[in-house]
Amino acid sequence: IIKPAVPVLTTVEHPEALNVIMETAEKAGARLVCSPDQISWRYNPGEVKLGTLLPSKVKAFTHGREWPEFELSLLGPHQASNASLVLACVHELQQQGIAIPQEAIKYGLANTQWLARMEVFGKSPLVVLDCAHNRASAKVLVNTLGSSFPKGPKTLLFGVSVDKDIKGMFAEFGQFFEKVLFTQSLYSPRAAKPEDLAHLWSQVSQKPSYSEPILEKAMAMALETTPPDGILCVTGSVFLAGEVRSILPNYLPV
């Protein structure tokens, strides 16, 4: 991917990963622009109230340039990192003579849509659909739910592939959700069995869990047992998120 004389921009901060990027860029003779020295940001979390999103905001600094504060349509501090990287790319393109007006930047950041990425449905309870399928994304999910959503009972509807770091994800979820319902994707050939997930859960948490392999029944049960002032979070795999998104209108009021 890294090509000679083509700028490389990254907000990766993991030392091992960044070292590989730096070494590869140096060998290719590609200029590297990276955080935190050349790309940094301040994040003001958004908030969801009564099903309405109050946008998060990012204030980015790239190439020694201070950008205006922009609203973001996507929730989570990781999206502020992504937006800052976008702004760094915009700067590079502008330096090459490509005209990108500030209004276009503002519109793009405020109107980006990414299905099943902290996607919010309903009001009582709120339903949050996400694709977290490893420990790192599970941690970001929990942190964002804690910072941007109302306080209240939280239910997890979870299905995942057998080859994922399931115990690592459970370590992030264990202290956050009051109860968990395990199900599985109909279309994933690697979907873990709900009863196996429940067994693993019992090893890391004393909180109650339930198993229902039929997704439609699991969805109905999760909604019925989540209080109106609560949050139902559905996550674990792209397969599961896609299936839930297709059936969700059947369970929510028009």
Residue ranges with predicted function:
Residues 58-179:
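Nucleotide phosphate-binding/pyrophosphate-handling subdomain across enzymes
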Residues 1-69, 87-106:
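Acidic, Mg2+-coordinating active-site environments of NTP-dependent enzymes
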Residues 17-18, 240-242:
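Short, active-site-adjacent cap segments at secondary-structure transitions
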Residues 237:
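Active-site-proximal loop/hinge segments that shape catalytic or ion-binding/gating pockets
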Residues 11-33, 126-129, 135, 170-231:
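C-terminal helical cap/extension that packs against the catalytic core
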